[in-house]
Amino acid sequence: MTDKEITGPPARRLYHPLVETLEKYYAEHGDNHRGLGFRTEEGFEARYRVYLEVIRDAAARQECTLLDVGCGTARLLDLIKALGRSEITYRGVDLSPKLIEAARKKHPEGDFTLGDPFDLEEIWSARPDYVVFGQIFTCRLEMSVAEMTDYMVRMLRLAFTHCRRGIAFNVMSKHVDWERDDLFHVPFDEMADLLQANLNRNYVFRADYGLYEYTVYVYK
């Protein structure tokens, strides 16, 4: 696969249909768990609580910045506010104009950027402490496993290069009752190999929240 197939031309990249699918869910169901592709509200919140736990020493409430890539309607910011985590300075970025518009309506004071992370130098030059990728690597639709893996690795390398402390992201587990062809199931050992080859070996796997997926933390 060439760089152009993944990161250019900007008008149409292999992962853009993922955004279109989420916009369809949102149009049908609105700003709730089903509108963002989740089956239950409980599972939705469990994921986002785990994303936030990438922040080490949270009890100390040290100030930090967090970049939410694929922020959607900013449900992670909803949770941050509900938990009173005022020490977190949040910024969201998304490819969908419709979802960014919804996020801005809910949080008019929020910092949201519309665009593709591969093209937005300004979000990386700010050097966020943490980068969270919420659910953008779980569904591959028509992308092959190789294409999806390449997309994920390129995005993770970009984020890890520019963050100060660490990143969090999730993928579907291989330990499931059955696998769906449109989802991205990654074995633990394969993920470990990818991380060691492209980021580092300072990582944590989280599969303790009752869903058929796992979340990965990678720290500097």
Question: Can you name each region flagged by the protein language model?
Answer:
Residues 130-149:
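A short SAM/SAH-binding and catalytic strip from SAM-dependent methyltransferases
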Residues 67, 74-119:
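Class I SAM-dependent methyltransferase SAM/SAH-binding core
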Residues 178-220:
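Class I S-adenosyl-L-methionine
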Residues 43-62, 79:
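Conserved alpha-helix/loop element of class I SAM-dependent methyltransferases that forms part
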Residues 151-158, 162:
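Short, conserved SAM-binding segment of the class I
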Residues 163-171:
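Conserved beta-strand signature within the Rossmann-like core of class I S-adenosyl-L-methionine
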Residues 119-125:
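Short conserved loop adjoining the S-adenosyl-L-methionine
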Residues 1-33:
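N-terminal, positively charged/glycine-rich alpha-helical extensions of SAM-dependent methyltransferases
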